[in-house]
A protein has these predicted regions:
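Short, solvent-exposed beta-strand edge segments and adjacent coil->beta transition regions
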Residues: 3-7, 65-69
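Vicinal oxygen chelate
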Residues: 7, 32-33, 40, 81-135
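Core segments of cupin and vicinal oxygen chelate
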Residues: 2-3, 9-51
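Short, charged/polar surface micro-motifs in flexible loops or helix N-caps
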Residues: 47-51, 60-62, 76-79
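Short, charged/polar, Gly/Pro-enriched secondary-structure boundary elements
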Residues: 49-53, 110-113
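Short hydrophobic/aromatic beta-strand micro-patches
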Residues: 9-11, 71-75
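Short amphipathic alpha-helices within nucleic acid-binding modules
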Residues: 21, 78-83
Length: 135
């Protein structure tokens, strides 16, 4: 049996501002539904992903800005950093680690994201030697 993550809730203060932010960085706004006066659900999907995020009113009990540890895989960390900065997002990186190359950014509410370029595992021993890391 396959188990696949479908949605991750991201708590925000301003739904429209967050929707604009995520679409500006490349997410697709799949759904924007107001069910009633207490529930509005916006589903946004990163390019190439089968998993989406949802933002809105009444979708999570988390406080805005408290979602951390969301990580996406990108083909090239340098290009991802360049893209984010080109659309006005403050991002930091590229951090070169044995387990990948990372770029970090926050959404307007402070929810923290990491983008990971997967390493060439065939070069892991070389990386460890260059960085003085032993097992």
């Amino acid at each position: 049996m396959d188990w696949k993550i479908e949605l991750v809730a991201v708590p925000v203060t301003d739904i429209d501002r967050a929707t604009e932010f995520y679409t500006r960085i490349g997410f697709v706004a799949d759904h924007d539904q107001r069910v009633d006066e207490t529930l509005r659900f916006v589903q946004l999907t990163p390019p190439g992903s089968a998993c989406s995020i949802c933002i809105g009113q009444g979708v999570t009990d988390m406080e805005p800005g408290t979602q951390t540890g969301i990580q996406m895989v990108v083909p090239n960390a340098d290009e991802a950093l360049a893209h984010l900065t080109s659309v006005g997002v403050e991002a930091k990186g590229v951090d070169d680690l044995a387990w990948g190359r990372f770029v970090y950014f926050n959404d307007p509410d402070g929810n923290a994201w990491a983008l990971q370029e997967l390493p060439d595992y065939s070069r892991l021993d070389e990386w460890r030697e260059e960085h003085g890391v032993s097992l």
